[in-house]
Structures are given as C-alpha cells and as structure tokens.
Amino acid sequence: MSWFERGLLIWLLLLCLPAQAELRLVLQPAGLSELQRSASQALLVEARRSLPPVLVSRLDSVVPVRWSTALDAEVVGRASATGAVLLNYDRLAALTAVDSEGAQKASRKLLLATLVHELAHLYDRGRYVSREQHPLLQDCQSQQQSLGLIGLPARCRGQAERQFTLSDDPRLLDLAGWPEQMGERGAREVTNHQRDRSPDSYELASPSEFVAVNLEYFLLDPQYACRRPALFAYFRQHFSWAPADVQACSGSYPYLNASLDPSQQALGRIDPERVYAVHYLLAEPNEAWASRWGHSMLRLVVCAPGRPRGPDCMLDVDQHLVLSFRAFVEDVQLSSWDGLTGNYPSRLFILPLTQVVDEYTKLELRSLSSIPLQLNAQEREGLLQQAAQLHWSYDGTYYFINNNCAVETLKLLRSGTANTTLRNLESITPTGLLALLEGRGLADDSVLADRDWAMRRGYFFDSFRERYQVMFDVVRAHLKVPSERVEDWLALGAQQRANWLNMGDQRTTAALLLLEQAAQRRQLLLVRQELKERYLALRDTGHAELNQTEQLMRQLLAESGYLSRPAELLTAGYGLPQADEWQQLQQRSSERRQGLLDMAGSLDEQLLALLDAERRDEIEAGKHNISLLAERLRELHRAGGGLQLR
C-alpha cells in the first residue's frame, strides 16, 4: 500500500469517528481592535474554563458572542432568542483599560459573571435530561395523562410538565423559595419571600433568573458552599462536579437567639453532629381564637458538648432548641382581620426549649407534646441547613388560615428533608398535621403512651394548671381554705390569701409558695390585658402620659423585629454569615439586645404608672405574700433540722 493510499484510509477512518460534541464560544470580531479582540478572547477562555464539564458537553453548539450597542446602559449582557450572547459595548473600554488595573479587574469580573449568567439561561432553556431522570419524567407524563392531577403519585408532583433543565425542577423550587401552595395540588407560590441576604435581588424575579444568578455564584464564588450549602449540594449533584477552589466550611450554622434572657447567649451555632433527633413539638389547643388548633413547632434535640449522640441527649434540655414560625405583630393588639388578610410577617424564631416550655406551661397553662420524627441522618442534616437558610433569609406573610404555623412547618419539612412522602400531605392545623405524620409513619407517638414516663424522659411537658391543682389539694388536705378549685383560690385577693399563710406545715407552706407565685403570674397577665385595653381606649386621644408611653412601646416593638429577622444586623454579604461577619454580628446583637432591655425597663415603669392604685396595691401585696412564705419555709426547714448553707 502506497503512502497515498495509507493516508487516504486514515482520513476516511477519522471521518467515521464521532466528533466530540461540546460548547464553543466564538467571538464576533467585527469592528474590534487587536487589543479588544485579545481581551475579549481571554474573557471567553476564562468563562469556558469555569463551566462544569456536563454543561459544556450538553451545550454542544457554537454560541456566538458579540459586543452590542443596542443594549440599555444598565444591561451588561443578554442571551438572544437565536442562541447568541450579547455584551454591552459600553463595558468594553473598562475591560481594555491599561491605565487602571482596578477598573479592568472589576470589569472582567462583572463580564465573566454576565457570560456565565447568560450561558446558564441557554443551558436551562435546553431542557437537558440525564439518563437517570429520563425514566421518571416519562413515567410521570404517562401517569398524568391517564390519571390526571388528582391521582398523580407524590414523586410525580411537578415532574410531568417540566420544560426546563433546572428552573422548574421541584427540588430546586423548594430550596429557592417557591414552595407548593397548600391544597393547590402542586401549584407553586408566586412570590419568593426568601428575600433577605440575597446576593442579587434579581434572583427573586423568577425561577429562571434564580438559576442564572446562583450558577454565577456556584461557579465563581468560593464561599458559595458555606453561604448556601443546600443549593451548592444541589448543583454539585446535578453536574456531578464542583469548582476546585471551594472554601472549607465550619460545619455548623449560625443563629440568633430570639430570647431576651440576659443569661442566654445572643448568638449561637447549630452543630449537626450534636443534633440527635428532631421532634414535632405541639402546644395543645386552648380557648383563644388564635390558638384553638394548637401551635406546631420543631424541637432540635441537641446533645451537651462531649456527650455522644444517643437517647441520653434527651436529658440535655438546656441545650435543646425550638424552631417556631410565628406572626411578627408590631402592635399590642392581635387583629383577626390582619391575620386573615396577611398583614403580619411570618418569620422563623429560634428559641431555647426551656423558654418555650415556660411560656406555654406556666403562662398559657398549655401542655406540650414532643413526638420524634422518623428522619434519617441525611434528612436531618438537610432540615438543619434549610432551617438556618430560612432563619437568615425568610420574611413571609402569615395567614391564620392557609399560611400559619402548621403550613410553614410542613413546608420546612418538605424542603429540608426532600422526603417525597411529605409532598402530598395537606393540613392547615397543627393537630391535623400531627395526625397525618403519624398516619404516614413519620412521627412516633408511642412515646406518649405512658404519661409519667413521657414526662420523666422529656416527651411531655404538662400544663402547670394540673400541678397547681395538685398543690392546692395538698393545701386543702391540711387547711380549711374557702375554695375547692385552684382557679377560685388564685382569683382571691392577695390579702384574703394572706390569712392562711402562717398555718401550714413545711409541705403545705411549700405548696402555698408555689401557688402564690402562680397567683402573681396571673396578676401580671391581668395587668397586661388591662393596660392593653386602657392603651387602646386612650390611644390617639392626646393623653400626655400615654403619648410618651405609646411612642416607647412602638419603638420597642419595632426594635424587637431583628430577633426574628437577624439579617437586619448585617449590611453586606449573603446567605449564612461567615467568620468575617461574626464580630459585627456579636457587636450589633449585643447592642440591640441591651437597648431592648433598657427600653423594656423604662416601659414597665411607665405602664405601672398608668395602673390604678387598687391594682398596684394587689401586685405589692402579692410580692409581700411571696416574701412571707419564703421566710416561713426557711424557718420551718431550720426547725426541722434541715441542712444550713453558710
């Protein structure tokens, strides 16, 4: 065989081999100088190098890139309907500036992000489906055609009508801030309420813009993995790839403690390695119209430092945290109309469990049930990530009927765990949601079967109403008091109760002390209600003392907003705060907390001044009774030979 025949054969064989399909960015050089062409080509090479291999191989076409004079001044670039990328010609001068290295660097960074952004749009519009996804989409489309929306399996919600690669993926929409509306068979919310600490507010305009903006940060920002860990994991899984220069993350998630207890740290970190379990925490219903179906929360069972994860972590109650969606009410009066029409923000409060237990069992006299959720380690980790993300970004709208605590909690469980069993659960009440979770095997209520055991192990926190009745039964067994029910005893005036305070033995006196403390708490609640009614009656009437008090009250309510919206404490950055923002967070949270405590002290003084003399006397008499009982208990203890601490 001659060299000519051999060469021809090789050439024919090469023609038969499949070409390597991949994206090619081709500069349109018309009208550009040599310097401009060189700078533009370098930009395209850098953009191409930053893209995931999967994206490059799927976008297997020539994408023309052209500098355009037709774009508005504020538009840096745009992907055209024909598949080309247009860059604003006005930005070219800064890219080629030889006398300003800073301007050139800033321009290159902006143009690089723009190129990635527009290529992300092209990729999203391409509706690229992986080999693993294809059977699911085919099956879901077939089932929707035969069964319709009503009979569609949970795993098919949002899959059958897919038109894009990423921006209509149900998983991405959950993480991004377009969750499913309750009772709408998969229809998504129109508005994205994860608006705080956004890297670019343009991402909130639509899911397609969200994808483009976040692909910019996924590819170009080394901190993205730490600031938006759930979304980083989503893109990494989609592309089976991650950028090489990803920053190492701390592994724990920062949060702001919504408690104003001075003994508590204002800032904390949730370490997933210390979270043993997640419980559905239910406050029982009461007669108040806003609480008649209970209140749903999530309890994080956090182990004490050094304790291995296990059942004993249930004993570390002082470490446990509560995730509670609540309406942020910037007024003393809770309005049913405002609650029905969505005039209250819905926010995720993070509170110590001990405070939540006191709030419900002692003040509201409502019991709490803590039911373990059946989550695996991956679901638990995802839930913690999403809760932290919502804590720093979410400012929703609270509706008492269709976007209340139960709905918000269910949406968090869906987006955090990605458990498809949750997708077709529908409930707008806390008790109803618990029943559904139990019915699907996601909640284990067997821990409540033995009430005494449940109380000892921390699965049930009884209302103090029952405890008060037990204490009162002790009193009635030793003293001939005039009341039969504890409510009647607490309703007596402090001076009437004082007649019986010096008659009991040590056990009876201890019971009387607990009841007197309960009576004082009840009195303070009555004072709060009386002051609210007086305040509302005299508001806007020109009452001099009230005007000053009203101004302070409004300021206090407005200033307390940061407790549920911690993003207010930071002026820059996005997503979860990082180490370089921690010092600013500590300083500002400390200053704001002290300011609130000072205002609250001043407000208490002014409000007490508005009380009538009879109510003030009742409060003082209650304090006196508590002091007398405490002293008598010490005397009886000494007389009985009890241990004395010196």
Give residue spans per PLM region:
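Auxiliary, metal-adjacent structural segments of Zn-dependent hydrolase domains
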Residues: 22-95, 154-158
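Glycine-rich catalytic cores of cysteine/serine-nucleophile enzymes that process amide/ester linkages
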Residues: 78-86, 91-114, 274-365, 605
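Active-site recognition of the HExxH zinc-binding catalytic motif
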Residues: 109-129, 212
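Second-shell loop/turn segments in exported
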Residues: 29-38, 95-110, 197-202, 283-287, ...
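Activation targets extended, charge/polar-rich intrinsically disordered C-terminal tails
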Residues: 95-103, 125, 130-203, 213, ...
